[in-house]
Amino acid sequence: MSQSTYTLQCISRAVAFMSEKTRDGKTPDLEAIATAAGLSKYHFNRVYKLATGETPQETLTRFKLARAADQLRDHEVSVTDAAFAAGYGSSQAFAKALKRVLSASATDVRIDHERLGNAIETLKIPQSRGEGSVSIEIAKLEPFEAIAIRTDSAYPALNERYWALFEAAGDPAIVEAILGQPYGDIGPDNWNTLRFDCSLKLSAPAKTYPENIVETQIVGGLALLKRHLGSYDHLPASIDDLYHATLCLKDVKIAEEPLLFHYLDDPEITAEAELRTDVYLPLVA
């Protein structure tokens, strides 16, 4: 089975799962959707967006709005009841979502039957988006040890963590690589829940480190590699290129491991436009 076929089957399972849950008035979280899809929770959000043109949250919003809008066909059902039936906590939350997606109020669509029908059909279809270009190679990483500081909800403000790692390393000459691993989507919408490991590969590790620094194993193996050039703020675009490549390559599958960033330049002495970051997407061997 090709990766594109496998991924589309996973996406289909995710869509079916979300559809079923929203019909029951429930709103599953991202991890539950990824589990139902059979895709790594670390990569699911962006893979789903590339395959469908929207995020899982946007799909859930469409499904919930479609269910609520369908309820509005019945004039015996209040807007509040329609909102609760679709999984919204209040009629205000439903009204805001409807206004954002359709630029209309519940009253507007309810009194205009044609508009209501068009709204329901619109909510069934994701909005199309463009795709980026792809410049990818396959690499093999040997396993290695690193020292790391694990953070939660700190990305992208990580400078102090890396300074602490360099201080613990002692001699800058023994630093072989500056690394990072995001355990999820690094898009701004996810910063408040993102775990991110800041790490260094050293040629001569110390015997002991401060309590906030742990020794960790980078598992290595096959990976898709793209060299990102420019601001770290634009890393998501290069990550999307890697995920897009998995849809085009035959017989590759994303591993249950986080992305690996290898920061090749010092941002204090390198112009932002010239910063190089090697981005690795681990694959199942």
What spans do the regions from the language model cover?
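Short, structured coil/loop segments at alpha-helix boundaries
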Residues: 1-4, 8, 157, 211-212
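DNA-binding recognition helix and immediately preceding turn/loop
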Residues: 3-55, 71-91
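A solvent-exposed interaction/effector surface
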Residues: 50, 54-58, 62, 66, ...
